[in-house]
Swiss-Prot record:
Heteromultimer composed of HisG and HisZ subunits. It comes from Staphylococcus epidermidis (strain ATCC 35984 / DSM 28319 / BCRC 17069 / CCUG 31568 / BM 3577 / RP62A). The keyword RNA-binding does not apply. Required for the first step of histidine biosynthesis. May allow the feedback regulation of ATP phosphoribosyltransferase activity by histidine. This is ATP phosphoribosyltransferase regulatory subunit. The lineage of its organism: Bacteria, Bacillati, Bacillota, Bacilli, Bacillales. This function is generally fulfilled by the C-terminal part of HisG, which is missing in some bacteria such as this one.
Length: 270
């Protein structure tokens, strides 16, 4: 037990030290967020079902369940001159405490964020002594590009998320692009996608660029996910999920966001 605790703390410390050496600003935020009723958005209120909230006197508090969301909210209200930050700490999900390390880049040009990925990959390989086994790649504009607005009902979106082909066929017909893509192996779906999206569509450009970049850097097992729906309205672009070879519970996830703040985040559960 003692060795496990020490090992986890050492990983967090080595992460922060490494990224500090790579010129990231190390930041530390309280696990408990104090929220301002006057600034809560409709989306914030919808999160109450998935977060631990409580009220004390005239203030409302919540336990952090997502670092990107916390930093997005904070830096939207209090703009920072930091261009890229690194963090380590706890998040609370489904009443479980999870250790997470991650980075945010507030200058999310392609060359910058691919370098962020390489930094993270170096940490995984040389500190965790692990490696990326395969990648799931997607884009939060795909659903809008492939599915007509009148079909984007709650029922249909749930069937897409569940990959319920039989139900979708009854609603959309067999020849619908969503059906034709989902019935293929996820390793082949990127090729199929090109039949239904113009080559210059922003989602297609982003997915192709990342897919080619990963291939050029030796990661060739790339699965497409056309079912993903943005967890927050400010997630509007590419998303990445990387599964590791030796630790099934450790997943590197990331994505582009643009709302009151623009950035790209990567987070790894330890």
């Amino acid at each position: 037990m003692n060795n496990t605790i020490i090992s986890m703390k050492e990983k967090e410390l080595r992460f922060l030290k490494f990224f500090h050496q790579q010129k990231y600003n190390v930041v530390d935020f309280n696990l408990i967020e104090e929220l301002d009723w006057q600034r809560l958005t409709h989306e914030d209120l919808q999160q109450m079902d998935e977060r631990s909230f409580w009220q004390q006197n005239k203030s409302i508090y919540a336990l952090r369940n997502d670092f990107t969301d916390q930093l997005f909210r904070y830096y939207s209200n209090y703009p920072t001159h930091f261009k890229k930050v690194a963090y380590a700490g706890d998040i609370i999900r489904d009443n479980r405490v999870i250790k997470q390390v991650g980075i945010e880049n507030y200058e999310p040009q392609f060359d910058n964020i691919t370098q962020n990925f390489l930094d993270f990959q170096y940490f995984i390989q040389n500190v965790l002594h692990d490696d990326i086994q395969f990648i799931i790649l997607g884009h939060y504009q795909l659903i809008d590009a492939l599915l007509e607005k009148n079909h984007q009902t709650r029922e249909v979106m749930e069937m897409i998320e569940e990959r319920n082909l039989s139900g979708l066929i009854q609603t959309l017909t067999f020849n619908h692009p969503i059906i034709q893509i989902l019935k293929e192996n996820t390793l082949n779906q990127l090729k199929i996608l090109s039949h239904y999206l113009p080559e210059r569509h922003p989602a297609m450009v982003a997915i192709q660029s990342w897919s080619q970049w990963f291939t050029d850097h030796g990661i060739t097992e790339i699965h497409l996910d056309v079912t993903a729906q943005a967890p927050r309205s400010y997630y509007k672009g590419i998303f990445i999920k990387c599964h590791l070879k030796n630790t099934a519970h450790s997943v590197l996830t990331g994505g582009y966001y643009h709302g009151s703040l623009e950035g790209f985040g990567l987070g790894l559960t330890l």
